């Protein structure tokens, strides 16, 4: 074999097959950019173990992480959205709904369940932000009212985890009506003397923040959650001024007295149970054993 044949044989040798990694095994933190093992991140409730950044969490997973295992019963799942107005922007509303339902496996942006929290009966609602930005339409409002009615029937407290861009524009006035509808329902909770706790997660904006999300007997926020009516960019363009750092974030709002406390997600379940037990004059719950990954200290010189 000549020298040129040896070179050609080496260049045409089939490379060894590399082990393929299934899609979705790894993910990257939105804040620090650290590559994270997906299963470990899920065990840590979507909180980055390196920088403690609270990533967005699916509504159904959130309810399962808070309520007692085996106690959950879904409410209002039979309610489904309809394109009554035959609305169309760049795409038909019914097509947007179909796409969102296919992508999320949910029928709308709010999931309601009743169950127990450390043995206490409770009704809980959580937004699915992946469903059209967690926007509030007729079904979201109807399910929220169903949650209130169930809490009244069971004489138990209610809590809601908000993650929404606001009212759903494709339902026009019908979506705006839900602001008054949900607020009126909560007035019945107040008359009965039953606690309603609102947990604001990233983001809670628009018509949701202007209605039931800020009407809690206790308004709790997750760290660095964006909370407000209009977004920072819209405000800057309107007032033509640069907004202060951290504007509309949880830490900014608690300084101004707009919310009551900031609670990290790994201890949220126990904090909610403790507060509700006190509000309902029940014995204090036993503290959960939290097995979260330790947050690595940040290098100040980095």
From Swiss-Prot:
* Role: Component of the acetyl coenzyme A carboxylase (ACC) complex. Biotin carboxylase (BC) catalyzes the carboxylation of biotin on its carrier protein (BCCP) and then the CO(2) group is transferred by the transcarboxylase to acetyl-CoA to form malonyl-CoA.
Annotated positions binding Zn(2+): 29, 32, 48, 51
Q: What is this protein called?
A: Acetyl-coenzyme A carboxylase carboxyl transferase subunit beta
Please give the catalytic activity noted in the UniProt record. Answer: N(6)-carboxybiotinyl-L-lysyl-[protein] + acetyl-CoA = N(6)-biotinyl-L-lysyl-[protein] + malonyl-CoA
- Name one cellular component (GO) term: acetate CoA-transferase complex
Similarity section: Belongs to the AccD/PCCB family.
The record's section on Gene3D superfamilies has: 2-enoyl-CoA Hydratase, Chain A, domain 1
**Which NCBIfam families does the record match to this protein?**
accD
Q: Which residues form the CoA carboxyltransferase N-terminal domain?
A: 25-294
> Which pathway or pathways does this protein act in?
Lipid metabolism; malonyl-CoA biosynthesis; malonyl-CoA from acetyl-CoA: step 1/1
Biological process GO terms, please?
fatty acid biosynthetic process; malonyl-CoA biosynthetic process
User: What is the name of the gene encoding this protein?
Assistant: accD
- Enumerate the residue ranges forming zinc fingers (C4-type): 29-51
* Alphabetized UniProt keyword annotations: ATP-binding, Cytoplasm, Fatty acid biosynthesis, Fatty acid metabolism, Lipid biosynthesis, Lipid metabolism, Metal-binding, Nucleotide-binding, Transferase, Zinc, Zinc-finger
What's a Gene Ontology MF term here? acetyl-CoA carboxylase activity
The entry describes its oligomerization and partners as: Acetyl-CoA carboxylase is a heterohexamer composed of biotin carboxyl carrier protein (AccB), biotin carboxylase (AccC) and two subunits each of ACCase subunit alpha (AccA) and ACCase subunit beta (AccD).
Main EC class the enzyme belongs to = transferase
Names of the cofactor(s): Zn(2+)
Quote the cofactor binding remark: Binds 1 zinc ion per subunit.
**Predominant cellular place of this UniProt entry's protein:** cytoplasm
What's its EC?
2.1.3.15
Pfam family of this protein, just one?
A: Carboxyl_trans
């Amino acid at each position: 074999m000549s020298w040129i044949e040896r070179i050609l044989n080496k260049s045409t040798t089939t490379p060894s097959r590399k082990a393929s990694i299934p899609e979705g095994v790894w993910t990257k933190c939105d804040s620090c950019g650290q590559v994270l093992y997906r299963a470990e991140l899920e065990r840590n409730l979507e909180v980055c173990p390196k920088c403690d950044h609270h990533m967005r969490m699916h509504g159904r997973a959130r309810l399962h992480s808070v309520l007692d295992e085996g106690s959950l019963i879904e409410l209002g799942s039979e309610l489904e959205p309809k394109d009554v107005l035959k609305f169309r922007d760049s795409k038909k509303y019914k097509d947007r709904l179909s796409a969102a339902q296919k992508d999320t496996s949910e029928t709308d942006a709010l999931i309601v369940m009743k169950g127990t929290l450390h043995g206490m009966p409770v009704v809980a609602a959580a937004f699915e932000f992946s469903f059209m930005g967690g926007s509030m339409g007729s079904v979201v409002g109807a399910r929220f009212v169903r949650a209130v009615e169930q809490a009244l029937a069971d004489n138990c407290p209610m809590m809601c985890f908000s993650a929404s861009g606001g009212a759903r524009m494709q339902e026009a006035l019908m979506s705006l009506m839900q602001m008054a509808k949900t607020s009126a329902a909560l007035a019945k909770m107040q008359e009965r003397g039953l606690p309603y706790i609102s947990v604001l997660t990233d983001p809670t904006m628009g018509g949701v923040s202007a209605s039931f999300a800020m009407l809690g007997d206790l308004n709790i926020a997750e760290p660095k959650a964006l909370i407000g009516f209009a977004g920072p960019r819209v405000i800057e363009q309107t007032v033509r001024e640069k907004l202060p750092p951290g504007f509309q974030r949880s830490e900014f709002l608690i300084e101004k007295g707009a919310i009551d406390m900031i609670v990290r997600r790994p201890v949220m379940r126990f904090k909610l149970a403790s507060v509700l037990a006190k509000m309902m004059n029940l014995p204090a719950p036993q503290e959960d054993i939290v097995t979260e990954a330790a947050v690595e200290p940040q290098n100040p010189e980095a």
